[in-house]
């Protein structure tokens, strides 16, 4: 989770705070999003891991009214039981007075029950997000988090539902937050998948996102596009995203 610091919602919704609102969405994406078969363009994670003995790369660009972010999240599963993700993103703003900001993500994920066709699975992930531009120096403030993804398969995998619940410790604000996400993927054809989800925490209004994923080379290379926004928020909280995902069968 996701792809993707969490700020006080009152500050996030305050006009003239583009960096805070933007980075809140970035972190939420990083928190909920770690690659798997559901993966891009989902923020809500699933109960799957990257292919055993291999790595994958997800990269995407997200466009807001006054900023653009670019992300790259490589993930590897060398043993088949533990997946590691190490990546980051950069945000650039239309306002020339605002410098670009960067985030870095480190996460580990495992499964307690793998997801089977017409069955269910669940697991756990733990990680941290760092914000060097906001918290400079050798002792960077960041966020430590844990979440539990649950996935359920229906109709021979034509429909798969995902549910996430988690906890976040905001080091910079010394605050705890409960996180959540719910999403669905509908496999319209063997190449085309429709996705929809909602996600957020216990202190702010929810976000939603919907879009499509298309496998140019099934099980190897896909592209996707989404539109999303925060419920009840202004157009500044609306985004469009385009992404790619590369999933080779074996690297080790």
Model-derived regions: residue spans:
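N-terminal secretory signal peptides that target proteins for export/translocation
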Residues: 1-18
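Charged interaction patches that mediate protein-protein contacts
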Residues: 2, 25-28, 89
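Intrinsic disorder/low-complexity segments in short proteins, especially the signal peptide
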Residues: 7, 33-36
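Bacterial N-terminal signal peptides
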Residues: 21-33
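Transmembrane beta-barrel domains of Gram-negative outer membranes and organellar outer membranes
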Residues: 37-252
